[in-house]
């Protein structure tokens, strides 16, 4: 029975009632016009009666017959016709909005039926951008969008896969579930946008840009959740991008895009957990089987010798044959269903007739009989991934004792027979491999001569279609008869395979090929039994010499006389499978885009190859696969457990080694502390608020040096540049990230420096290790010292350039590997290198001639020789020595740790009271005791950043003791990055000493200046320690610190308080304006280049503004520090006058006021 073709033009199914509605003839011709299809012939009066167009469901518009012959609303057809006619090359099409007033007017005219043709539309508005905006407005105002609300979540989930073939196949399946009105309009819109994207050279609207514009318009969630819309935006744009790029495949059911990299495989995701998807799969399979119940018209000449010319003409004379796209005016190709002689080949390279008649005479006895039977069943049940269109009508096998004649005849059946067709994927190679037997035996595919040379070949698939089909006719009387009369043995096999068995076998093979799913059994109604299991395919990439030709791997259906052979072969194959099956699923290889030359198809070649090569002639052997999978999973779990155990053992060994090292180091420290018995500290009153660790011991005859902070995980230097001026024994402790303490005893004589480099190497070569190895190599080539303190300015500049180069190489390699520049978290591994870069840069600033000149000019008294703790002279030599030899000295050491305020009152009747308030905020991990020289180094010193000292040492640990003055022992020609001559000593003394000259009291004000990073504001923490004596009073007040590199500090101190405030407000305003300009430049740079300002070359256009901005920052910090100095000095004077009035009777007392003032500056 021949059925009429079902298209949108002759039937319509009402979604609400389910009834079929036949449209009127006027609706069919409504879109055509006498001028060539410009618009609809429906009168405006009729359109007005039909009602509005915008904001109306598409189903209602279609039922009202408000569509044209292309099954799209008239407003869409009018606008698309104008675009195709004259606006394909207009720049910014669909992106540039039109006039909103005109847009609303056009909407009103369409709703009132005043626009019936595209000429009417052009008369109302000829701006193509306004018309394009009207098209988007129509789609946007649909109550149910083109991608309906009910399928929104399914579309979003289908785009979550990383494999493009899975995304495209899933999208095609979901598009088939759209209502027919939505599907028709979406197809028309995708075709229009596809044509627009082909003119992207002129209109600048690529498929990606169009997807961004139309994605939110055609697809939106039912509840407008802003967060959900933002999260799903990339999926929405990606789905519509596939709609445009894969138009031919998605909207033409039997036509695939010519891009061979896209396959038709539709994989089931989460089938066990999602029964709906499983139902969709069977719905899709039913769509393939639906052609079995139809009877299309075939060629009139069924003979196997039909010529190609007759074939082409017969196909052209069959207008209703096969499947035709619903849009006849488009360029979609036809995909015909026919037998092998009716295949239309679009390739010009194939001009030969297909002849599948094979007559072979071989004297091979019973083995040929079995081989013939294998080949017959292979063609019935086994499907090769490279096969072209294959037609099988009848197979006859006759084996006689005298002459063995194997006649394989392929004949066309009559037109009234049913047909089952199935679509199969092929490989991505341009020329599929022909299916031919591997032995010189008889074959239905070609003619083999006596020498075993294959003379015949099947027709390969047309190059325009990367898909092949298998056509099997209804063979109710298919007989596979094999007669063997040799030796009195008569074996008659009459296998009658009906149509039902054939379809059942094809369904099983379809599942195994397309979906990696093997069905255990099917009922007569082709229903799936319950509790079916999914069997993943195997990866045979590691199996060697098991991929033979497609025809050599066969699946046989043997009779009862061959049961023993079947059992033996199955046992052997099981052993082979247990030894050769890989543990990696092919889904893993597909997800990671791993291709293999042995894989002839991307659907599931591994499973088919194993089944054909190992499971001999029996599909029931698939039942053994779950056991094999269980064994594989158990092996994987065992291997994982073994690996975890090995890792745990390695970690335990490492921890044990670290503990042993720590114990050894502690023992060494203990031994050294026992040897240093001559180290003593005379303290009559010890108020120790310092924690037990770290312990800091001070030696009277030891100069204190603070080297630069070594980079973490890198070479650490144990010597300071000041050590050549002292003959002593150095006991150094350096802490690296692996907690390895190396004690180096170095004997330093005059100018002998012993540098011990402790290299911390990691097991894996991370970028940091590679960078430091490169830097070490560059230093050796340039013959530079590894200690940056001993480098000259030129060497420091070279070191800075080398570090910068390594940092840029890290950024470049990161971008090459991950496709983007590293973020802040990604750069964390390179933090030690950044720290070293800042240290080198600070040394360059300190050692530059301009910086040295300014610092020397601002300092009043610099020691010409290094001053150690054993020196009895104070730093300020203009004053006489106030520390006479007294036999009774009370050293009040107040060690205040962790920012605690301690007030100690000690009533003493002696003449000389030395009150030393040591405020310790220690970030270091250890401090070593030694006889003569104590060198402090810690991994946390880089946080102090260029601390300065004028009369006392300021480092990670504040140190005080005795009547000995404390000073940095840096030589005059070498400047440390953390200890430099102070620029604010004179300004502070000028601000304080003019109120401290009362009677004969000698007040020595020692100010400790701590430098921190700028820009900063002031938050002063005062540490007060008052000592009330009957003969003397000493007060220690907290003062602020100033930055050594602040320019013109002494000039600022000459200004009045109001002038300083005005200057501060003015400079801050200038800095703010410059900051806005620089921020604007950064924003424009990011928009233009797609990245932030990162390199020096990027700042060239605003280099002057950038330098000015840095100067203003330094000036603001200096002004802030001066203002805080004045404020704190006012408090100091108030306290000093109060104490001075209480001590007028003590005119011959020597008061040493040691003011250790620490001010913590925080960032703005």
Curated annotation (Swiss-Prot):
SUPFAM superfamilies given in the database record: beta-sandwich domain of Sec23/24, GTPase activation domain, GAP
InterPro entries, A to Z: FAM13 (IPR039102), Rho_GTPase_activation_prot (IPR008936), RhoGAP_dom (IPR000198)
Subcellular location: Membrane
Annotated keywords: Coiled coil, GTPase activation, Membrane, Transmembrane, Transmembrane helix
Coiled-coil regions listed: 627-685, 1057-1130
GO biological process, one term: small GTPase-mediated signal transduction
Region (Disordered): 1-46, 302-329, 348-371, 391-468, 545-581, 666-768, 849-1050, 1130-1164
Transmembrane segments annotated in the record for this chain: 279-299
Entries under Gene3D superfamilies matching the protein: Rho GTPase activation protein (1.10.555.10)
CDD domains per UniProt: RhoGAP
GO cellular component: cytoplasm; membrane
Marked site positions, Arginine finger: 95
Chain intervals with Polar residues compositional bias: 1-21, 444-456, 698-728, 979-995
The Rho-GAP domain, residue ranges: 56-251
Highest taxon of source: Eukaryota
MF terms (GO), sorted A to Z: GTPase activator activity
Annotated membrane topology: Single-pass membrane protein
Biased composition (Low complexity): 22-32, 393-418, 545-579, 676-697, 729-766, 853-939, 964-976, 996-1009, 1024-1048, 1140-1158
Function: Rho GTPase-activating protein involved in the signal transduction pathway.
Protein name (database record): Rho GTPase-activating protein gacU
Upper taxonomic lineage: Eukaryota, Amoebozoa, Evosea, Eumycetozoa, Dictyostelia
Gene name for this UniProt entry: gacU
């Amino acid at each position: 029975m021949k059925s009429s073709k079902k298209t949108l033009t002759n039937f319509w199914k009402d979604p609400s009632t389910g009834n079929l509605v036949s449209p009127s003839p006027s609706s069919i011709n409504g879109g055509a016009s006498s001028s060539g299809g410009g618009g609809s012939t429906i009168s405006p009066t009729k359109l007005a009666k039909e009602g509005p167009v915008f904001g109306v469901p598409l189903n209602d518009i279609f039922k009202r017959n408000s569509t044209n012959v292309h099954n799209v609303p008239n407003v869409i057809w009018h606008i698309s016709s104008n675009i195709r006619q004259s606006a394909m090359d207009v720049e910014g099409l669909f992106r540039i909005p039109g006039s909103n007033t005109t847009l609303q007017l056009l909407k009103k005219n369409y709703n009132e039926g005043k626009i019936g043709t595209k000429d009417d539309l052009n008369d109302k508005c000829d701006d193509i951008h306004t018309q394009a905006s009207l098209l988007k407005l129509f789609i946007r105002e649909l109550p149910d969008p083109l991608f309906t609300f009910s399928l929104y979540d399914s579309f979003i989930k289908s785009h979550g896969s990383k494999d493009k073939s899975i995304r495209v196949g899933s999208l095609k399946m979901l598009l088939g579930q759209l209502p027919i009105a939505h599907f028709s309009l979406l197809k028309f819109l995708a075709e229009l946008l596809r044509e627009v994207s082909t003119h992207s050279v002129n209109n600048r609207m690529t498929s990606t840009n169009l997807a961004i514009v139309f994605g939110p318009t055609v697809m939106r969630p039912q509840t407008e959740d802003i967060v959900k819309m933002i999260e799903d935006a990339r999926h929405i744009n990606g789905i519509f991008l596939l709609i445009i790029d894969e138009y031919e495949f998605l909207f033409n059911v039997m036509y695939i895009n010519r891009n061979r990299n896209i396959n038709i495989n539709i994989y089931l995701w989460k089938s066990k957990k999602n029964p709906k998807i499983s139902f969709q799969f069977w719905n899709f399979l039913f769509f393939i089987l639906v052609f079995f119940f139809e009877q299309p018209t075939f060629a009139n000449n069924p003979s196997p010798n039909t010529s190609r010319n007759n074939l082409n003409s017969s196909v052209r004379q069959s207008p209703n044959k096969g499947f035709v796209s619903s849009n006849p005016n488009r360029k979609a190709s036809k995909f015909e269903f026919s037998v092998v002689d009716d295949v239309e080949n679009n390739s010009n390279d194939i001009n030969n007739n297909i002849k599948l008649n094979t007559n072979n005479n071989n004297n091979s006895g019973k083995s040929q009989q079995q081989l013939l039977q294998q080949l017959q069943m292979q063609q019935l049940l086994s499907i090769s991934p490279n096969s072209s269109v294959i037609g099988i009508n009848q197979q006859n096998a006759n084996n006689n004792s005298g002459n063995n004649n194997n006649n394989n005849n392929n004949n066309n059946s009559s037109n009234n027979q049913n047909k089952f067709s199935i679509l199969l994927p092929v490989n991505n190679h341009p020329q599929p491999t022909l299916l031919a037997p591997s032995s010189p035996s008889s074959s239905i595919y070609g003619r083999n001569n006596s020498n075993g040379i294959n003379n015949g070949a099947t027709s390969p698939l047309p190059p325009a279609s990367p898909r092949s089909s298998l056509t099997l006719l209804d063979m109710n009387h298919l007989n596979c008869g094999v007669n063997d009369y040799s030796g009195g043995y008569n074996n008659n096999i009459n296998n009658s395979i009906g149509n039902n068995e054939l379809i059942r076998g094809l369904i099983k093979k379809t599942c195994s090929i397309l979906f990696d799913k093997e069905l255990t059994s099917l009922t007569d109604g082709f229903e799936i039994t319950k509790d079916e299991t999914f069997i993943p395919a195997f990866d045979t990439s590691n199996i060697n010499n098991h991929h033979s030709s497609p025809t050599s791997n066969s699946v046989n259906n043997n009779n009862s006389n061959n049961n023993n052979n079947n059992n033996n072969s199955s046992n052997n194959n099981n052993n082979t499978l247990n030894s050769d099956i890989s543990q990696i699923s092919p889904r893993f290889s597909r997800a990671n885009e791993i291709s293999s030359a042995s894989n002839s198809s991307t659907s599931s070649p591994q499973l088919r190859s194993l089944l054909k090569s190992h499971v001999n002639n029996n599909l029931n052997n698939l039942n053994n696969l779950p056991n094999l999978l269980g064994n594989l999973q158990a092996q994987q779990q065992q291997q994982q457990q073994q690996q975890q155990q090995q890792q745990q053992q390695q970690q335990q060994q490492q921890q044990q080694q670290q503990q042993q090292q720590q114990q050894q180091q502690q023992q060494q420290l203990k031994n050294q502390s026992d040897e240093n018995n001559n180290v003593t500290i005379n303290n009559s009153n010890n108020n120790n608020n310092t924690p037990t660790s770290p312990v800091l011991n001070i030696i009277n005859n030891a100069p204190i040096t603070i080297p630069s902070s070594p980079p973490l995980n890198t070479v650490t230097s144990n010597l300071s540049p000041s050590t050549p001026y002292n003959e002593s024994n150095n006991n150094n402790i350096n802490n690296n990230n692996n907690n390895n303490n190396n004690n180096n005893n170095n004997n330093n004589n005059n100018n002998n420096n012993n540098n011990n480099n402790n290299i911390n190497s990691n097991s894996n070569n991370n970028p940091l290790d590679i960078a430091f190895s490169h830097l070490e190599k560059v230093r050796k080539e340039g013959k530079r010292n590894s200690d940056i303190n001993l480098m000259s300015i030129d060497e420091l500049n070279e070191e800075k350039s080398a570090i910068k180069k390594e940092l840029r190489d890290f950024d470049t390699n990161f971008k090459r590997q991950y496709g983007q520049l590293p973020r802040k978290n990604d750069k964390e591994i390179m933090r030690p290198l950044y720290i070293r870069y800042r240290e080198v840069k600070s040394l360059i600033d300190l050692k530059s001639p301009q910086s040295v000149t300014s610092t020397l000019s601002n300092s009043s008294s610099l020691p010409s020789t290094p001053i150690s703790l054993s020196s009895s002279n104070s730093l300020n030599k203009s004053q006489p020595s106030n520390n006479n030899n007294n036999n009774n000295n009370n050293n009040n050491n107040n060690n205040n740790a962790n920012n605690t305020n301690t007030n100690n009152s000690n009533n003493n009747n002696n003449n000389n009271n030395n009150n030393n308030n040591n405020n310790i905020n220690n970030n270091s991990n250890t401090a070593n005791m030694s006889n003569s020289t104590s060198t402090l180094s810690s991994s946390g010193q880089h946080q102090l950043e260029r601390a300065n000292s004028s009369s006392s040492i300021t480092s990670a640990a504040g140190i005080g003791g005795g009547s000995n003055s404390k000073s940095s022992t840096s030589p005059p020609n070498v400047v440390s990055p953390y200890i430099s001559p102070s620029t604010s000593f004179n300004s502070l003394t000028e601000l304080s000493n003019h109120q401290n000259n009362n009677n004969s009291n000698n007040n020595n004000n020692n100010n400790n200046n701590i430098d921190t990073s700028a820009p900063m504001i002031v938050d002063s923490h005062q540490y007060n320690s008052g000592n009330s004596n009957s003969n003397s009073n000493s007060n220690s007040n907290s003062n602020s610190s100033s930055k050594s590199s602040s320019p013109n500090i002494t000039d600022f101190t000459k200004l009045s308080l109001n002038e300083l405030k005005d200057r501060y407000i003015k400079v801050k305003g200038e800095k703010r304006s410059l900051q806005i300009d620089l921020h604007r430049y950064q924003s424009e740079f990011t928009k233009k280049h797609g990245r932030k300002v990162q390199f020096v070359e990027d700042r060239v256009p605003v280099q002057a503004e950038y330098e000015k901005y840095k100067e203003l920052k330094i000036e603001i910090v200096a002004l802030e520090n001066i203002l805080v100095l004045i404020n704190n000095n006012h408090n100091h004077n108030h306290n000093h006058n109060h104490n001075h009035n209480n001590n007028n009777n003590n005119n011959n007392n020597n008061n040493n006021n040691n003011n250790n003032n620490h001010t913590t500056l925080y960032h703005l």
